[in-house]
Amino acid sequence: MESLYSQFAQVLERYYQSGTKIVLAFSGGVDSRLLLELLSRYQKAYSVDNQSTDSHSFKCHAVYVHHGLSSNADEWAGKCLVWAEQAGITCSVERVSLDTNSGESIELLAREARYQALAKHIQSGDLLLTGQHADDQVETFLLALKRGSGPKGLSSMAESMPFAGGTLVRPLLAIKREQIEAVAKEQGLDWVEDESNQDTRYDRNFLRHRIMPELSERWPSIHQAVQRSASLCAQQEALLDELLLAVFERALQSDFSLSIEELATHSELARARLVRMWLAKLNANMPTQVQLNLIWNEVALAQQDANPKLQLKQGEVRRFQNRLYWVTETVDVTTWQSAIQTDTALLLPEQLGELTLSTNSEQATIAMPPHPELLRVTFNPEGLSAHPTTRSHSRKLKKLFQEYNVPSWLRRQIPILMYQDKVVAVGNLFVDQAFSGQDCELIWRKSL
């Protein structure tokens, strides 16, 4: 236990900062069960080291995700709540439902739902601990190999990765399953055994029960070898990104679109990499090699009068004004509106960023109206007209969006600053002539 705790503490100390909340993905299986005990011990040690008897100064919380797939799930949730209470760690249960008729694998659906549920508990800077270990790493590597993945996929799992504004950390990634089980038994811990883990119809279980024992018996150092290969692949990926970073920054536009003109100056291999970097930045799933070719040949190079698009899993790649855009399904926000106060960031709906009417800007372009309390923000351009300072007369917003080259799918996603029934400014596009001045600036900070 001491050796394993020491490794756990070393990993945690690489990422933990005072005031950070730690969230444990707690399934009740042996991996997360042991993590709960390690986290509880770390919490107590932290309180002693910081001369505090208040264990809550070290903020941690466990989350059990109830998928509803097993008749035992309610019992498992109850056990997790009890174990967490005994460990002195708060715990909550998140219930999710899966669309088992979607055609997707149950494994993938459960994984996506699980991480969506966990993301609700993560705020900026928080840590999410998960229980993946060295055997999981080998399985992930072999599954990527089976899919024909390149270096990115073969990099498998990193010790840490960005997640929901915080960081996902895998403290047990260098530890074998047999060592985890041995320590758990040594400590007298109980844990849940998910019956689905024995079902070899699932690829990961097939590898775990049929393939891994054979590999480990033939090559006892297979775990270290796979970890080394995965690490080398990850290094190659990082090097490629580093070498192409300057090119990528030139191609990436302020609205997160990608310049086709810039892409066209590079080789096919470089173009494919730049598109992958772009989609990764936008948190989209990576396309296949076939899809990468389609993005270039059938979207980027389509006839100029065409409106090409390629549907991928989480959204679609579209072309507009010689740029590639990543378009996800959007929620209608045209009924949303809110008052706005000067020098106070207004959080916009559906991750559309934040809006600030700043009176401290050196680039002020707006005259403050006589009754600032009547200022409001809307997203509905229907029936509205405006007279931009750069235009000779007033026009409907629908026409102005066309003139300002705003893609059709973004026109109801741009915040409009209103004063009573008059348009003051539209996003970062223009200010109406009637409100032109030097009192304040409308600053729109967009989210990815």
UniProtKB/Swiss-Prot annotation:
Binding site for ATP: S27, G28, G29, V30, D31, S32
Keywords linked to the UniProt accession: ATP-binding, Cytoplasm, Ligase, Nucleotide-binding, tRNA processing
GO CC aspect terms: cytoplasm
GO molecular function: ATP binding; tRNA(Ile)-lysidine synthase activity
Keyword Nucleotide-binding carried by entry: yes
Broad enzyme group: ligase
Gene Ontology process terms (BP): tRNA modification
Cell compartment(s), UniProt: Cytoplasm
SUPFAM superfamilies attached to this UniProt entry: Adenine nucleotide alpha hydrolases-like, MesJ substrate recognition domain-like, PheT/TilS domain
Gene3D superfamilies: 1.20.59.20, HUPs
Domain remark from Swiss-Prot or TrEMBL: The N-terminal region contains the highly conserved SGGXDS motif, predicted to be a P-loop motif involved in ATP binding.
Main function: Ligates lysine onto the cytidine present at position 34 of the AUA codon-specific tRNA(Ile) that contains the anticodon CAU, in an ATP-dependent manner. Cytidine is converted to lysidine, thus changing the amino acid specificity of the tRNA from methionine to isoleucine.
Protein name: tRNA(Ile)-lysidine synthase
Native source organism of the sequence: Vibrio campbellii (strain ATCC BAA-1116)
